[in-house]
């Protein structure tokens, strides 16, 4: 049994988008489906994947496998973010801000799916520019990945956490 198969039961999987695409050939059109999925353990690990196939279930399965292989760690502060963060990918710009307990996930569409599977429970967020789900997912993960824990920053600078936090 591989590592991915052992972790599979505890992973949360969300389907973000299914899109039908067409290849035009001499005899007509050939249709295929693309799927965008996000996978996370709810404890600070999240990944996304894309799959393409002639049938929807196969495309979703391929996307889930790609998402499991593509997981990254996110430094969370309990159920929220460490500090406000901005990120951009392509035309999509996202802004995410920590929120107090009980606020919930204030985010839309693709960004909400990423935050839910990552284990974030309280966050204020906004997406600017393009709302293309692929770019929103990429920029959200890029922003989450860019956050560093105070312990990491303190160790890198050779100072204590109290000096860093003021």
Curated annotation (Swiss-Prot):
Print the keywords alphabetically. Answer: Ribonucleoprotein, Ribosomal protein, RNA-binding, rRNA-binding
* GO biological-process terms attached to the record: translation
Report the superkingdom from the record.
Bacteria
SUPFAM superfamilies, alphabetized: dsRNA-binding domain-like, Ribosomal protein S5 domain 2-like
Quote the InterPro entries the UniProt record gives.
Ribosomal_Su5_D2-typ_SF, Ribosomal_uS5, Ribosomal_uS5_bac-type, Ribosomal_uS5_C, Ribosomal_uS5_N, Ribosomal_uS5_N_CS, Ribsml_uS5_D2-typ_fold_subgr
- GO cellular component terms given for this protein: small ribosomal subunit
Ranges in coiled-coil conformation: none
Chain segments annotated as transmembrane:
none
Where in the numbering of this chain does the S5 DRBM domain appear? 11-74
Q: Which GO terms describe its molecular function?
A: rRNA binding; structural constituent of ribosome
According to the UniProt entry, the note on domains is:
The N-terminal domain interacts with the head of the 30S subunit; the C-terminal domain interacts with the body and contacts protein S4. The interaction surface between S4 and S5 is involved in control of translational fidelity.
Family note: Belongs to the universal ribosomal protein uS5 family.
Subunit (UniProt): Part of the 30S ribosomal subunit. Contacts proteins S4 and S8.
Q: Summarize the protein's role.
A: With S4 and S12 plays an important role in translational accuracy. Located at the back of the 30S subunit body where it stabilizes the conformation of the head with respect to the body.
Its protein name is Small ribosomal subunit protein uS5
> Which species is listed as the source?
Marinobacter nauticus (strain ATCC 700491 / DSM 11845 / VT8)
Q: Gene encoding this polypeptide?
A: rpsE
